[in-house]
Amino acid sequence: MTRTARIERQTSESKVLVEVDLDGTGRHDVSTGVGFYDHMLTAFARHALVDLTVQTDGDTHIDAHHTVEDTAIALGQALRQALGDKRGIRRFGDATVPLDEALVQAVVDVSGRPYCVHTGEPEGQQYVQLGGTTPAYLGSLTQHVFESIAFHGHFALHVRVLAGREPHHIVETQFKAVARAFRDAVALDPRETGIPSTKGAL
């Protein structure tokens, strides 16, 4: 069973190509025009062990918002497509990940029901500008990214920032925690021969 997908998404604001392989090794080729976001998506690929290609050409002369959002939408769509009917997966994933002073818990349920709960970021985190290139990545985009991925990927996602002071660490730890939780949730369980739901469908 090959769990791969390719999504192409084009609007008046961006053109996005996303390719994923859920059974990869974390190989990545990411270019969105937003340097910090590239760094975060690379971390996601590496720690989820998902092979990930992202090529986005967006209206970064305005700001990063459309580019970041549209990439997240396409990534969610690709993850959903690659999962297929979800036969044989573990379904649930729970990871708590540190990065120096930052600590984040992420929990995933590949339920087919989109939901995202995002809590715990310190006051002012949403206004922080991150990255050494223009346009900067605004801290408020992090919640928006996870909401977009969860809603278009059709899974429930809870992200709780438990500790953190350095804004870069706070964002990066979230991406790594979500990656590890997702990795566990989509892993194939040799004892699960069907779809992991009493309803028979996810």
From Swiss-Prot:
MF (Gene Ontology): imidazoleglycerol-phosphate dehydratase activity
SS bond partners: none
NCBIfam families noted in UniProt: PRK00951.1-6, PRK00951.2-1, PRK00951.2-4
InterPro entries linked to this entry: IGPD_sf (IPR038494), ImidazoleglycerolP_deHydtase (IPR000807), ImidazoleglycerP_deHydtase_CS (IPR020565), Ribosomal_Su5_D2-typ_SF (IPR020568)
Gene: hisB
Subcellular location: Cytoplasm
Entry-linked Pfam families: IGPD
Superkingdom in the source lineage: Bacteria
Enzyme Commission number(s) from the entry: 4.2.1.19
Family named by the database record: Belongs to the imidazoleglycerol-phosphate dehydratase family.
Name by which UniProt lists this protein: Imidazoleglycerol-phosphate dehydratase
Organism, scientific name: Nocardioides sp. (strain ATCC BAA-499 / JS614)
Matching SUPFAM superfamilies: Ribosomal protein S5 domain 2-like
Pathway entry: Amino-acid biosynthesis; L-histidine biosynthesis; L-histidine from 5-phospho-alpha-D-ribose 1-diphosphate: step 6/9
